[in-house]
Amino acid sequence: MKTQQVRNGRPRLSVAIIVRNEQEVIAETLESIRAIADEIIVWDSGSEDETMSLARKNGAKVFQGFWKNDFSAARNDCLSKISGDWVLWLDAGEKLADLSAKKIRDFIDSAADPQKTYLIMVEIPPADNRTAGEQIAQPRLLPAKAGLKFEGRLRETLYPSIQAAGLKVETAPGLISRHPRQHSQARKTRLANRDLGLVELELIDGNGSDPRLFLAQGEAYINLGSFDRAREAFIKAIELSEPGSSEMLEGYYGLLTGYNYDPDLRDAQMRVCLNALEVFPLDVQLLLAVGSYFQIHNRLDLATRAFETAVKFGQTNSSIWHLCELPELAASCLSIALQLQGKEDEACRVLEEALDRHPQSARLLRLAIDSYIKTGNAEQCIKVAQRGGMLSSREDPLVLAIRGACKAAKQEWTPALTDLQSAYLMGCRSKLCLRWLAVALLSNGQAEAAKPVLDQWQKLEPANPELLAYIAAVRETQNAFVIKAEQEAEEEVGKVKTAVRQYRIDPGSAISEIHPIRIPFVQHVTSSDMSITEET
């Protein structure tokens, strides 16, 4: 890698990618950066598929290297092929999201300082539409300076050489989005087995005092389902970490994750969480976790205090994997805790203030609409829908659906059905309309009429637990009519109404998204400081 040199007044950008057997995703990655890259370097460690051919077809210079069971060796060899002034690191399967390519190119051309390295946010999409994604800020944009190099067989890092070179670290614009395959269990298993082997090699080399090795080991055991071993590894990582360091916080996240899979260990999990809060008292994720624990145990006063602290003073360590939308999630948790205490007005005020800060948050918009429906406040609900761009005009059929939903929440079934069915006939197929129309029909004992509505709702949210409860209740009712007398079947109809009442307590089942709080961060902690690749 050469020293910084700008040609023709415009810095040259080299994009560097390490690959092995990535034919399914390499083209998409290269397509996302082709317009801004002056050079694309693909370093291949032994692909047996069409990866190299596809890379060349998409404009990359391809170099074949020998995999030495060492990520740093691979990355440093790749760096030696670079001829640009700046290096942007990507992995196969990653791409620059939305307008990020232009933002990064403009930043390099006008604002990037060769005496600095830059963090770029990397995001993993959510596994489904009911969970949050995860993100981390990683050093992905580097000046092409001699002396910058990676260290570590796995979880390789640039930070020692960045510090030695006297470079500052700041944040650049843009977002790198990872492929949904991050959620593939088969892939997690393959990478976990690889990483355990690399950890063992590092330990043989005498590097057993590095907490990052045990963080990687713990992550691997989590993905293999060996939770006892995972907890042991994370405890070791915590013991080896500097107090208050990112490694220690990540160790606590991992240890808490290791308790997620056994409900009998919930109390032990919370003891760990409280210990972690003594070191990291304002960490948002820890506050949400302990607040959820108190909420489960009906200590709503303590839950509210934890959530309120997260909203007002919460901090996020962006250098380790954390949930996306943490401020929005904290406000949602606080609002729900207040609702459970009957403090509806205060809960709505929390959501309104959060929407002022995050006006495009789908989570907050959904919860605010659910909250106003629950209180029967149709006009305020319509205002929130307008604010979120959900309504084309006041004549939008969704307005009728909202009015019907508010009436249904107050158990005014006949006028509710009139509005909801009118909205449906006018073509409204929003989840709000389908959900509340199904609720109204089921509450009136019209299970057969509710079936097509439930089917359409299921196409939008196939895993929604409220929906699945309704479908199961309808199916049970239909079976009852076949095998029982009419009088007995009436009792089964009551089960449908019971299911409706159960979910009507909390419209939208909003609590299910955060109650109990899961801490899945280590499931996506990478095999390296930079990325996951397919080296074996």
Q: How would you name each of these model-derived features?
A:
Residues 12-14:
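Cell-envelope/extracellular polymer assembly enzymes that use nucleotide-activated donors
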Residues 32, 44-56, 67, 91:
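A conserved acidic beta->alpha catalytic loop
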Residues 72-79, 90, 96-232:
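Catalytic-site signature of metal-activated, phosphate-bearing donor transferases
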Residues 52-77, 81:
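Conserved donor nucleotide-binding strand/loop of the catalytic core
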Residues 87:
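Short aromatic/hydrophobic "clamp" motif used to bind/position activated sugar donors
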Residues 17-36:
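Short, well-formed alpha-helical segments that are part of the catalytic scaffolds
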